[in-house]
Design a protein with these regions (language model features):
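Conserved phosphate-binding/catalytic region of the ribokinase-like
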Residues: 141, 156, 160, 183-293
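A glycine-rich helix N-cap at a beta->alpha junction
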Residues: 56-69
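Short beta-strand scaffold segments in enzyme catalytic cores
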Residues: 28, 73-77, 208-212
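Conserved phosphate-binding/catalytic loop of the ribokinase/pfkB sugar-kinase fold
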Residues: 76-113
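Conserved beta-alpha-beta core of the PfkB/ribokinase-like small-molecule kinase fold
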Residues: 115-183
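Charged helix-capping and loop-helix junction motifs
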Residues: 100-104, 128-136, 181-187, 219-225
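Glycine-rich phosphate/adenosyl-contacting loop at the front of the ribokinase-like
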Residues: 1-40, 49-50, 221, 227, ...
Length: 293
């Protein structure tokens, strides 16, 4: 819309209604970048049925488990200046039995069909944070490298299970208690490795992306762009990073592709609907610095 103003009726010029969530956005970006993606999660009620139908129509191969509670809705409003308002309903509940059914679906049917996996977002309300760790352990048993994008107690539970990759924002690392408030992106990445991640990536908005493993730190620049809508940029990063590693790229190359994909997404109006040619061009503007720990 032209301008976001409080206490006024807001009439958008364009609207996009589509299934969302961090995992779905990552799948959408993976397909945009030429990959194939299966989507899964716990869907509920009329909204959940619509999510599955819309994902199928979009070619995002839905294989979902179902719960009684209605799936939540999120609203994102962006104006011409790039300012945005995000209204996210709280996570809807699922029962332990409903999560157990989802985990069986994941272990028995989906992970065996995957080369890599991404688990992103929050566990449904009413479930213990340890269920994030259960997903990490399921992926390890299946031999599938897993990227975790989570915060708070769920992130800490995933770290205890020793995930292959963790990717979060620097501020999220601070809020989750991984590092102190004055920590840099490098500090956050190193802190995540010390907590259990084999490879950790910490983003810091448009400033910097840092990554670390047990022996090396990488610092990546972010291309200067005029962003239209940053929603889905982190998810696009996750998709590009995972695809690059699946194709055998080394870590700095995979990180550069992730940074470029996230930047390309920010140039679009709809989440995770990036142009792969724009992403490829932006990759040339990403520089990296490698530091031995």
């Amino acid at each position: 819309m032209a301008r976001i103003e409080l206490d006024e009726v807001l009439r958008p010029r364009e609207m996009f209604v589509l299934p969302g969530g961090k995992g779905v956005n990552a799948a959408r970006a993976a397909v945009a970048l030429g990959g194939r993606a299966i989507t899964t999660g716990i869907a509920g009620g009329h909204a959940g049925r619509w999510i599955v139908e819309a994902l199928s129509a979009e070619g995002l191969e839905p294989h979902w488990s179902f719960a009684r509670a209605e799936s939540r809705t999120a609203y994102v409003t962006v104006d011409e200046s790039g300012s945005s308002v995000l209204v996210y309903e709280r996570a809807t509940p699922a029962t332990p039995d409903e999560f157990a059914a989802f985990l069986r679906l994941l272990e028995e049917r989906l992970l065996p069909a995957c080369a890599r996996a991404v688990v992103a977002g929050s566990i449904p309300a009413g479930l213990p944070p340890s269920d994030h760790g259960a997903i990490v352990e399921a992926a390890r048993r299946a031999g599938v490298p897993l990227l975790v994008d989570a915060t708070g107690p769920g992130l800490l539970a995933a770290l205890e299970a020793g995930p292959d990759i963790v990717k979060i924002g620097r501020i999220e690392a601070v809020e989750s208690g991984v590092v102190s408030e004055d920590a840099t992106a490098v500090d956050a990445a190193v802190g995540l490795v010390e907590r259990g991640a084999r490879l950790a990536v910490a983003t810091d908005g448009a400033q910097e992306v840092a990554a670390a493993d047990a022996s090396t730190v990488w610092r990546m620049s972010v291309p200067p762009i005029e962003a239209l809508n940053p929603v889905g940029s982190g998810d696009s990063f996750n998709a590009a990073l995972s695809l690059a590693l699946m194709d055998g790229a080394d870590v700095p190359t995979a990180l550069a592709r992730g940074v470029a994909a996230g930047s390309a997404n920010a140039l679009t109006k709809s989440a995770a609907s990036l142009d792969p040619e724009v992403a490829a061009a932006l990759e040339d503007d990403v520089t990296d610095t490698t530091i031995e720990r």
